[in-house]
Amino acid sequence: YLLCGVALFSNVSIALTNIFLVPLTLVFGLRLYKKRDDWRRALPGGWMNISLGVLLAVLLVVSLFSPEMLRSMWIVLDDFGYRMLGMYAVLLFVRERRRLAVIALCALISYTVNNIVLIGQGVFLGNLRAAGFSFYMIVGSMLSMVTPVLLILLLSGRIAPPYHSVVMGAFAVSLPAIYYNGTRGAWIAIAVTLLITCGILIRRKKKFYIAVFCSGITVLGLCMVSPYLSERIASIGDMKMQSNTERICLWTSAFHMFEDHPLTGVGRGRFRSEYRDHYILPEAKEGALPHAHNNLIQMLAECGIFGALALIFFWGSFVAHGLRLWLRRRNPMGLVLLAVMMGFVLHGMTEYNMGHTNVVKFFGLLLGLCLAWIRADDEKECCV
């Protein structure tokens, strides 16, 4: 029930999500205290366990060299502990696919409700950076992770009839939400993720190429009737646009932090103060920015080369697991896991979505649902 509550409010309210997440944390800790051997089940398994352990170890070690050692360590534990609790809790507590489906349905309801509100803001208020109950960059990450997943589930033909119409409706709502949200980084992340995952899933490549062509024609037609859309797409490569030039300034400053502290970085959670006080470029127009608008560059600046490599290893282990599952067993959940990872990582190339607590919580929940479903499939095969 607590996991259903977390899922149901995951896209709507941080406060309401925490009402369920805090007691879930207590129940999770109590379960591990009473049944100490269960900690293995709460972990994703295989190389993903190793990569998670390496990432935590590296980030905690480099935090020892941070000017704010305790604060940096706390941020590390919060990032990959409390915020990712959804993954650990789903893996520990939920074994039946029926219950996993209920939690996933709650998450889908939350996602769709926010998208409906977002579309209403766009249609009736003329808001072309609409966000529903949230912030437009946060919604961009949610759309990047979920939209490809919905299409993969529809194309795989593995959804039970009662849920098929629900998934179809959620996907249909996602499309105008993508438009009215207006996050360019999310548009790129969704397009690339769909191209790769659907290209892998669809065996008849002729159908895939026709679908890509028709999608391109549709987008071109929308650009012709919507000046906003055409201008927004054209602005992606416009180096005179402030949001683009500001990102270049941020990335340059972050690289300077890395040059000065190549091994351990400036300290986890210290980007804002270091950027403002020491590394802001003269041409930068926004001096109080708290992050680098890029997950990997942020990690490189704050935790050095070791932190960045550990993060790549962590991401790569999940991507490899998804690909391996599809290639060996043709299990669509492998591509679902791949889509979640790609959506999060690709949107994180233009936004520091690791810094948005509700994005990371939702990301962890999605990973937990994917991995628990895969584990349930494995256990069923073993029983047979």
Residue ranges and their predicted role:
Residues 1-75, 95-99, 105, 153-165, ...:
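Transmembrane signal-anchor hairpin modules in multi-pass inner-membrane enzymes, especially those
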Residues 1-6, 170, 290, 323-350, ...:
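Loop-to-helix entry and N-terminal half of a specific, functionally important transmembrane alpha helix
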Residues 6, 57-60, 85-89, 95-126, ...:
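Alpha-helical transmembrane segments of multi-pass inner-membrane proteins
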Residues 15-34, 77-88, 138-147, 188-195, ...:
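Membrane-embedded alpha-helical segments of multi-pass membrane proteins
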Residues 23-31, 212, 333-349, 353-384:
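Transmembrane alpha-helices of multi-pass inner-membrane enzymes
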Residues 176, 180, 201-243, 250-260, ...:
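A membrane-periplasm/extracellular boundary helix in multi-pass inner-membrane enzymes
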Residues 238-252, 264-303:
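Long extracytoplasmic/lumenal interhelical loops at the membrane interface
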Residues 302-324:
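Selective detector of the "anchor" transmembrane alpha-helix that sits immediately C-terminal
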